[in-house]
């Protein structure tokens, strides 16, 4: 009887050890997608970011060097719009301008997690949830009134991640993106007040606010040295 109890305890310990080991596995990459809302700030909307909200869809691919850092590639397709009739400011001769466009964006972001993000391995103080900050560089393309445009953008923002399970992640992210162009809202609004735009001055902004879900894959080499 005692021997049977010992065998049962040993088997139970082995199963638990295997389960814990599985929960502690690390993965190098993350892939997923999301949907969200967009906003615009420019000549056709100078104050209220979501005066005419649009929508976007997103694909993402993330490299995970360690629990604190992530390097993410994003591809967006979405809509933007603005209407100067809703503004308190007026243009010369009382003109009003309205636009809508579909945009495409490819960007690269560096993310910093405030906590060591992950499941298991208590000695590394992994947290199932973590806020983060992000910054990077991207390129945006659009068409307004049949005229094509493209420009670099600088995305800056914040987000949060939550581990649904060992491999599945739920995320939320808000990014403001400064474009190096004043024609995101159309060539007609490039210089409505006669103030010439430059590479840094009088340029348009837009935002993306997304909910994402992603899946981790490609196990990290167990024999390799891992840097936190």
Where are these regions (language model features)?
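Short glycine/proline- and aromatic-enriched beta-strand/turn motifs that initiate or cap beta-hairpins
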Residues: 22-62, 208-221
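Outer-membrane beta-barrel channels and translocator barrels
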Residues: 26, 64-68, 115-117, 163-165, ...
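Residues that define the transmembrane beta-barrel architecture of outer-membrane proteins
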Residues: 27, 51-55, 102-106, 129, ...
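Residues on the lipid-exposed face of transmembrane beta-strands in outer-membrane beta-barrel proteins
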Residues: 33-37, 57-63, 108-112, 135-139, ...
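Outer-membrane beta-barrel translocator domains and adjoining extracellular loop/strand segments
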Residues: 43-48, 84-90, 121-124, 145-150, ...
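Gram-negative (and chloroplast) outer-membrane scaffold detector with strong preference
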Residues: 67-145, 211
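Predominantly the C-terminal beta-signal and adjacent terminal strand-loop region
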Residues: 85, 165-228
